[in-house]
Amino acid sequence: MHLPSLVLGLLGLGLTASASPIEERSNRSKAPDGCLTVGSSGKYSTIGAALDALGDSKSDACIFIGAGTYKEQITIDYKGKLTMYGETTDTSSYKKNQVTITHTISSPQAGTLDKSATVNVRSDGFKMYNINVINGYGKGSQAVALVANADKLGFYGCSFVGYQDTLYAKAGRQYYSNCYIEGATDYIFGNASAWFGECDIMSVGPGYITAMSRTTADQTTWYAIDNCNIYGKPGVDLTAKVYLGRPWRVLARVIYQNSQLSNIINPKGWTTMAEGATPLYYEYNNKGAGADTSKREYESSISGAVSMNTVLGSGWNSWIDTTY
């Protein structure tokens, strides 16, 4: 999503780094001022080592990761606001990202969904730019690429790849812009208030895109999928084999709006999971072969698109990078 420019400050590691603005550039081949560096020419050889170096500081900080594949499983629990940048030749999209973080383990093997995650975010105010995150386990079990379990999170030009339970938008307010999300079964799930703007969402097998877990009526959580492209893996016939979602918990709330829905979407649109569920499922102003709502089930009517204020609350432009 491209919004009017708003200058946001980003401090470096603290004692020696000066404040510098988030930069909108056609490429990012070197570290922004003040960032710790990871990679063959960086100070640290692993992302985990750079995270450890941040210690207990509460200052704003940033990490720049040079091109490469990093076989790591990382938890981000820094006490300050942290921004993580990946090297790329096109900052505006995930398509030319040169940094991949990958790990392979299923949830049963790890013990919990969170423990299976390649990247587990627990730090409020965290931002990630142009990084690919993969759980390589594949078909057969839940295996999470990203757990996003904090408030005011932003992911820009990132890629998240898995099969079942790829992206666990677990809790807090979250914003995904120009990202790629891949999976087959419940691959965007949880109970965050999450806005997905101008993302490519690709199913690689029959299944369900969302599995939202809103439980009680007083919870303000939503999944809003806005101006996104929903499609299937090239060469795989998924015609009418994918549902927009099913309710992991009884009051799931999801809207697809202003998006392109391909023929992979089943005419029924939505299906069931949680016993006794009365989900709030909406569609508004979508286009494409999968956008016909005449045979939809479990769907409620809505008179217009929902706003970012509705999903993320007032003041969202104080923590989202609106220059992106």
Curated annotation (Swiss-Prot):
Residues marked Transition state stabilizer (site): 164
Localization annotation: Secreted
Keyword annotations of the record: Aspartyl esterase, Cell wall biogenesis/degradation, Glycoprotein, Hydrolase, Secreted, Signal
Active site: 165, 186
CC terms in the record's Gene Ontology section: extracellular region
UniProt-annotated glycosylation sites, renumbered to this chain: 27, 191
Enzyme class: hydrolase
Signal peptide extent: 1-19
Pathway(s) it belongs to: Glycan metabolism; pectin degradation; 2-dehydro-3-deoxy-D-gluconate from pectin: step 1/5
GO terms for MF: pectinesterase activity
Job description of the protein: Involved in maceration and soft-rotting of plant tissue.
Protein family membership: Belongs to the pectinesterase family.
Protein name: Probable pectinesterase A
Native source organism of the sequence: Neosartorya fischeri (strain ATCC 1020 / DSM 3700 / CBS 544.65 / FGSC A1164 / JCM 1740 / NRRL 181 / WB 181)
